[in-house]
């Protein structure tokens, strides 16, 4: 359990995945903000910047790679680690090329998710 709550922004267009990830991460003591759209900028400022972003690669209306490129180009957000997720394991190279620090292939094991999150926090 984290002694100091770290904030994680989870961006995915599947409500079930958002709910699942929020529950798992909150059970581990993290503060979690979720959004189902790529309109991430608004969420970044709700209560301060997150310490980590979990980002689905394919969102309705927005490409996760574009979001990462934008985040990494901005002074205030370029330091925030981004873990991209996709149902296509072959997308890891693309995610890293876009600027993501790490990648999770869906479906993933809870232990794998928590280990990657802990690695960056």
What are these regions (language model features)?
Residues 34-52:
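Acidic, metal-coordinating helix/loop segments flanking the phosphotransfer/catalytic sites
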Residues 65-78:
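Short amphipathic alpha-helix used as the core "switch/output" element in two-component signaling
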Residues 35-36, 59-62, 71:
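Hydrophobic residue at a beta-alpha junction
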Residues 56:
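Active-site residues of response regulator receiver
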Residues 109:
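Receiver (REC) domain switch/active-site region of two-component response regulators
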Residues 63-66, 88-104, 112-115:
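Alpha4 helix (beta4-alpha4-beta5 surface) of REC/receiver domains from two-component response regulators
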Residues 15-33:
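Two-component/phosphorelay signaling modules centered on CheY-like receiver
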Residues 83-85:
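Hydrophobic/aromatic residues positioned on beta-strands within the core alpha/beta folds
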């Amino acid at each position: 359990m984290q002694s100091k709550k770290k904030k994680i922004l989870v961006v995915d267009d599947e409500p079930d995945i958002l709910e699942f990830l929020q529950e798992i991460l909150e059970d581990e003591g993290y503060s979690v903000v979720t959004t189902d759209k790529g309109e991430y900028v608004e969420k970044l400022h709700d209560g301060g910047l997150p310490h980590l972003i979990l980002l689905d690669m394919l969102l309705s209306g927005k490409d996760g790679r574009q979001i990462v490129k934008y985040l990494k180009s901005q002074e205030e957000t370029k330091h925030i680690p981004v873990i991209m997720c996709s149902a296509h394991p072959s997308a890891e190279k693309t995610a890293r090329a876009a600027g993501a620090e790490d990648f999770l292939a869906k479906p993933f094991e809870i232990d794998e998710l928590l280990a990657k999150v802990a690695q960056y926090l």
